Amino acid sequence: MSNEQMIDIKGPLIGEIEVPGDKSMTHRAIMLASLATGQSTIYKPLLGEDCLRTIEIFKLLGVNIELAEEKIIVDSPGYNKFKTPHQTLYTGNSGTTTRLLAGLLSGLNLNCVLSGDASIGKRPMDRVMKPLRLMGANITGIDDNFTPLIIKPASINGITYKMEVASAQVKSALLFASLFSNDSSKITELDVSRNHTETMFEQFNIPISISGKEITTQPNAIEHIKAKDFYVPGDISSAAFFIVAALITPGSDITIHNVGINPTRSGIIDIVKQMEGNIECLNITDTSEPTASIRVKYTPNLKPVLIEGDIVPKAIDELPIIALLCTQASGTSIIKDAEELKVKETNRIDTTADMLGLLGFELQPTDDGLIIHPSEFKKSATVDSLTDHRIGMMLAIASLLSDKPLNIRQFDAVNVSFPGFLPKLMLLENEG
């Protein structure tokens, strides 16, 4: 990633759009469809770089996967007929692929090596490896914490485990490993995190029960899996950039259709409402993965907000763009309990404060979040995504607060989760 992109977009933003399919659900749909015997079709998936890495890995395991227009066709021999790969399974920049497959592959009686790019090589894996070993997994890594991860055949046991971090990736790794156990498992969350793995297990016929923060899987659960067609809602993490863009750009009025509003993911909607932003959800569907059309209008005089506790895991990936939104509030906002930001593609506490600080915004990083003061785009500077897709898109939205173009280095990082992000933003500008 080396390219530099000049962003020169002016408001108002007007119109109706859809955003790409949900990244979390696309990963999980590919994994579950590959484990099941037979054909599954995944409609409206995200075909960003992260999800393509997941697809390539299952191809190496012997699954036939075809990409067609707005769908993925998975034709699998089933988990018990996977073949041992004869090369490293490359996960690229995808923490989801790396951590979830650490659990899934641990139960497959295969010799595998998982490795990613330089960013993945810096992200902690002990949070997954330690509980997987308690389940009997044979998994090792560099300094017992970093990729590449070496996974060898092992017999997986059930586990009763209290999560030490509020991480959907760790939870999901354990749930995938538990599919191959002869015993039941009970996992208790620290705080409720995104529950796509649980809802999608049910859709692929895998028995699972949930009571508050407790999740219980059944013995030999993998034997119940069935091929299934799956429709992927639009990604609320991608919609978040357009939500904030409309809120901070005078005269804007946009509608984003078919966005997933799973209550474990929709923290940004709750936060915008706390700030008294003009946002409403229309055409809500009543399913295990609900969707809505989200209409957002420019809102001056936003209220400052304290973001802490249970809402943080429900908005963890959106916190950088929410931090930008908070600079436009009428008072000081605070984000707390967000230590997980430190172990994303970058330390997003520091990169958010540093990159917005270069433009004159006033944010103070703390050990677990940010203090954000009302501030303006005061000076022009060349900024950098630092290869983090969400930082790149956040900076592009920040440019709407300036009358001058903004140059962003390594902007192609946005292709990890949102190919076509800039043309979509320009479409709203042109309609306005």
Swiss-Prot record:
Q: Which SUPFAM superfamilies match?
A: EPT/RTPC-like
This protein's source sits in the domain of life called: Bacteria
Q: Which Pfam families match?
A: EPSP_synthase
| Catalytic activities | 3-phosphoshikimate + phosphoenolpyruvate = 5-O-(1-carboxyvinyl)-3-phosphoshikimate + phosphate
Gene Ontology CC, one term: cytoplasm
Known EC number: 2.5.1.19
Q: Which GO terms describe its molecular function?
A: 3-phosphoshikimate 1-carboxyvinyltransferase activity
UniProt keyword list: Amino-acid biosynthesis, Aromatic amino acid biosynthesis, Cytoplasm, Transferase
Q: Active-site residues?
A: D317
* Protein's cellular compartments: Cytoplasm
Residue sites binding 3-phosphoshikimate per the record: K23, S24, R28, S167, Q169, D317, K344
Q: Does the keyword tRNA processing apply?
A: no
Subunit structure, as described in the record: Monomer.
HAMAP family for this protein: EPSP_synth
**Protein's recorded name:** 3-phosphoshikimate 1-carboxyvinyltransferase
Originating species: Staphylococcus haemolyticus (strain JCSC1435)
Q: Which gene encodes it?
A: aroA
